[in-house]
């Protein structure tokens, strides 16, 4: 089974872009096209279907089975809704985007790969890059999704990108939906299990969930690695020269 799944090393790239990053995604995409090794297509998932960036296929987020309105209805109209929405867009991209390959690399729209970087090993495993973050509410949330999901690795799965395999994402969704007696779809359970007291801070992480699931159930399909990276305020020489990639979040830009 493993050899069958890993026989095809092609993959696509998915970038979810929100209003905060409309002014930076064109530049980050230049670095993606230059330094991500081996991709086929780049899909840009956006609330603005008219956004047009060279080398990318724009996907209207309206084709997904949920919307920002679902979050507004549940949590009220607030600035964090978009942050949780993009997490769900990442999970569902492999199920919704027409013609997307089974494997896809998620890259945050404010993340810049500075050096040529591989994402699949020679024997077909997915590289997953680790970070150092630890935020307890992430693990409390995933454990509410399913009792088996708990911190399994000393490092974090958060590094502003991740490599998803649709067959494994489906497995994760089925695990959670079955646990909740198939009464609701995964995306609704994901939202329901966010602690309201943590919502406005950071109450869930798609990257930690997927990293934990793969490390627990399919460790032979991933290769955990460390790259040099950091969060920066600008794309300056102080960051560029010492890192493999950087992220420049909207709230810290100079």
Which role does the model predict for each range below?
Residues 33, 94, 173, 177, ...:
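Non-transmembrane alpha-helical segments in soluble domains
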Residues 83-91, 110, 203-208:
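Conserved glycosyltransferase catalytic-site signature
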Residues 89-130:
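GT-A fold catalytic core of metal-dependent nucleotide-sugar glycosyltransferases
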Residues 117-195:
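Conserved catalytic core of nucleotide-sugar-dependent glycosyltransferases
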Residues 185-254:
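A glycosyltransferase accessory/donor-loop signature
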């Amino acid at each position: 089974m493993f050899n069958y799944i890993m026989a095809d090393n092609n993959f696509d790239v998915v970038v979810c872009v929100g209003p905060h990053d409309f002014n930076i995604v064109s530049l980050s995409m230049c670095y993606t096209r230059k330094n991500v090794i081996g991709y086929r297509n780049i899909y840009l998932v956006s609330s603005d279907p008219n956004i047009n960036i060279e080398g990318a296929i724009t996907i209207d987020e309206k084709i997904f089975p949920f919307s920002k309105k679902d979050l507004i209805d549940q949590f009220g109209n607030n600035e964090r809704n978009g942050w949780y929405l993009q997490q769900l867009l990442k999970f569902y991209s492999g199920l919704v985007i027409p013609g997307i390959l089974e494997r896809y690399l998620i890259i945050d729209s404010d993340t810049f790969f500075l050096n040529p970087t591989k994402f699949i090993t020679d024997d077909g495993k997915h590289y997953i890059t680790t970070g150092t973050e630890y935020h307890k509410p992430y693990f409390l949330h995933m454990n509410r999704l399913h009792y088996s999901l708990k911190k399994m690795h000393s490092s974090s799965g958060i590094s502003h990108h991740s490599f998803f395999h649709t067959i494994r994402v489906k497995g994760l969704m089925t695990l959670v939906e079955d646990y909740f007696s198939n009464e609701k779809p995964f995306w609704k359970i994901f939202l329901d299990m966010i602690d309201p007291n943590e919502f406005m801070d950071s109450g869930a992480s798609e990257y930690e969930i997927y990293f934990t699931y793969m490390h627990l159930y399919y460790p032979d399909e991933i290769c955990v690695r460390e790259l040099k990276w950091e969060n920066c305020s600008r794309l300056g020489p102080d960051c560029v020269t010492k890192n493999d990639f950087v992220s420049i979040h909207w709230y810290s830009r100079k």
